[in-house]
Each structure stands twice: as structure tokens, then as C-alpha cells.
Amino acid sequence: MTQQIKTCKRKVMDDEFYTMYKDVVRELHKYDLRNKRIICPCDNKNSNIYKYLKDCYYDVKCDDREWKNIDYSKYDIVITNPPFSQVREFIRYLISIKIDFIIIVSDVLRYGIKNNKTNFGIGIYKGKDAQKFYRPDGTITAVHCGWISNIKDDWEENEKL
């Protein structure tokens, strides 16, 4: 195998982090997703984000196409764990098409709240609380990351009910 192919394969693996079910529950259960058409453009039907949303009987779809080639007008919200190497471009795109989103980003504090277009999600995980992810090789690794969203913080109101 040439060095270039080895480097490319390593880069792809280094961009693959699969969210654990408990971390999905910890974040998403606080949002009111009833009657929302949800797309998970960077996940497949084996992802824990998709499984959680299906377990809660939400209207959720995965799409095998590249995230740039999806017709988002059919959906109300994007919930996904995008490839960390593409997250900046992905966020810019979602903001430009004015669709609600809840996504996981690595090194969340770097993104912060930009021009009042995104908010921190409920969970930001650093240090000993870093969120754990499955890797393609079956190992588990901790990543400093968090959820961001452009949805109004209605979960605070839901907590009071």
C-alpha cells in the first residue's frame, strides 16, 4: 500500500466517532421533537442517534447521499454527528439554509456562539467527563466535544413542567 493511501485511510478512521446511546439520551430527551420531520444526514440506521429517535417514535430518516446533496426542505430539523473534519462547512451550510439543528462538534468551545446563530447544547464534555465514542476498530475513546444547536432553549421550559 502506498504511503498516500495509508495516510488517507488513517484520516478517514480518525474522523469516525460513533456516539454512545446514553450520551444521545442525555442530550436529546430535553428537546421537544414531537411532530418534527428529522433528518440524520451523517448517520445510518445503526447509529445511536437514529436508534434513539426511532425508539421514541419520531419521524426520522437517514440518507445515504453526501450531506451536501440532500433536499433539506423536506425536514424540520437536522440531528447528527457529522465528520469532525467537515463540521465548520456543515454548520455554515445549515445556517445558510435556515434549518434547525442539533449536532455534536469536537472542541465545542472553539465554535462558541457565533453571531447569535448557535447555542451550546445541554452537554459540554471535557476532562474526565469527556464524551465517549466508539471507533470503527471497536475501541472506545474520549473526545472533548459537545452539542450545539440553533434551537431556542425550550428544554428549560420543559424541565419546569
Where are these regions (language model features)?
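Class I S-adenosyl-L-methionine-dependent methyltransferase catalytic core
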Residues: 1-77, 83-161
